[in-house]
Amino acid sequence: RKAQERMKALRPYARMMRKIVGHIARANTDYVHPFMADRSDVKRIGYIVLSTDRGLCGGLNSQLFRRILLDMRSWQEKGVEVDLVCVGSKAVSFFKRFNVNIVGSAVQLGEQPHVEQLVGVIKVMLDSFENSNLDRVYLCYNDFVNTMSQKPEVKTLLPVEADDKKDLPTYWDYIYEPDPAELLD
């Protein structure tokens, strides 16, 4: 229950952060950060999979893994290679059975994982994208609906997509210091 409340409390901050990044990116059209550069010719993608360390979660992990496999297969049919970072021992043990390149994992993180425990494995994907070794990075997790229902999600993490222009005002009165290019870096 505490974890659910923490997740609910963080949602508005995450939404606003994405919106602010979109505003900053639009404010400086001369500069495109590597994380925002769209790559139309997709040759390799990465998935960051968030799962549990223990079982007894009903279909929580299996629904997510099925959703990821469907997405992965659609990319592989197009000749795209796949890399995975698994957070949680259930994801590691599941995806080892498939012909997937697991480039990093973090397991046994406990009830309240610290950012330091995740930075290394997540950075593997970020660096690969920045160095043009990956063309897309997806974040895969179960979205909490209620205690009886979670919805498997596969969301694009990179390239960062700015908010739809229809949701944005024609102008905004933010002053960014330092300049937007430095903030995006």
Residue ranges and their predicted role:
Residues 1-185:
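C-terminal beta-strand-loop-alpha-helix "lid" module of Rossmann-like NAD(P)-dependent dehydrogenases
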